[in-house]
Amino acid sequence: MKKLKLHGFNNLTKSLSFCIYDICYAKTAEERDGYIAYIDELYNANRLTEILSETCSIIGANILNIARQDYEPQGASVTILVSEEPVDPKLIDKTEHPGPLPETVVAHLDKSHICVHTYPESHPEGGLCTFRADIEVSTCGVISPLKALNYLIHQLESDIVTIDYRVRGFTRDINGMKHFIDHEINSIQNFMSDDMKALYDMVDVNVYQENIFHTKMLLKEFDLKHYMFHTRPEDLTDSEREEITAALWKEMREIYYGRNMPAV
């Protein structure tokens, strides 16, 4: 896409929001409580603040204010307001490619925010526990928040990820013509690294004319030991392993497809 010469500030709002899910099997009530306590501590407000602050560093944003809170009995939220500094538009990379992990992108944000909320969850029947984190990066200016996608998914190791990206508003060029998007995009997947794409099965649902892009990700490899909390698969009987594997896989598919599925 040819670079635009704008009249005034770039008024496009670009929003990236995604849910990540971590699934676990905890055999007893004590193990379920232990998992919730573990995941709640792992992703407490301080840790989330560190992750989001690094995200700001990656995309070149200046932090104006941080609001964070841990909740009882569990959960946390962090919201960061960020601002823009003058930047040479010639230095802005608008091509479709994966964003960096810890590297710096020369770009800045204005009237923008980054926020995360966590939702640990379990049920007394079945032993299944889930952890969900909702993250939103909303920017107003020249850079797309998709540059932060790679880093965030790597930091929050996930079994399932659902991602939405949308562009709203318009900006004008020097001739007064409106532009409703200022960069090329045909898939969120183009902003992911090859190693990430190798780990997940992915499907897109995009509405190009509305500048709405959606990608769902499901971890390809299933290893039962990674889903057990304080229980080793080798300590279970064959039938127990099969039953737990089926329950976990059903849970993951239901979350991935967003609907309840019949028992197989």
UniProtKB/Swiss-Prot annotation:
Modification type Pyruvic acid (Ser): residues: 112
The entry's cellular-component GO terms read: cytosol
Keyword Lyase among record annotations:
yes
Supply the Gene3D superfamilies for this chain. S-adenosylmethionine decarboxylase
The site (Cleavage (non-hydrolytic)) lies at 111-112
Q: Which GO terms describe its molecular function?
A: adenosylmethionine decarboxylase activity
Q: Which cofactor does it need?
A: pyruvate
Its PTM note reads: Is synthesized initially as an inactive proenzyme. Formation of the active enzyme involves a self-maturation process in which the active site pyruvoyl group is generated from an internal serine residue via an autocatalytic post-translational modification. Two non-identical subunits are generated from the proenzyme in this reaction, and the pyruvate is formed at the N-terminus of the alpha chain, which is derived from the carboxyl end of the proenzyme.
Catalytic site:
112 (schiff-base intermediate with substrate), 117 (proton acceptor), 140 (proton donor)
What keyword terms does UniProt attach to this protein?
Autocatalytic cleavage, Decarboxylase, Lyase, Polyamine biosynthesis, Pyruvate, S-adenosyl-L-methionine, Schiff base, Spermidine biosynthesis, Zymogen
Q: What does this protein do?
A: Catalyzes the decarboxylation of S-adenosylmethionine to S-adenosylmethioninamine (dcAdoMet), the propylamine donor required for the synthesis of the polyamines spermine and spermidine from the diamine putrescine.
Could you identify this protein by its name? S-adenosylmethionine decarboxylase proenzyme
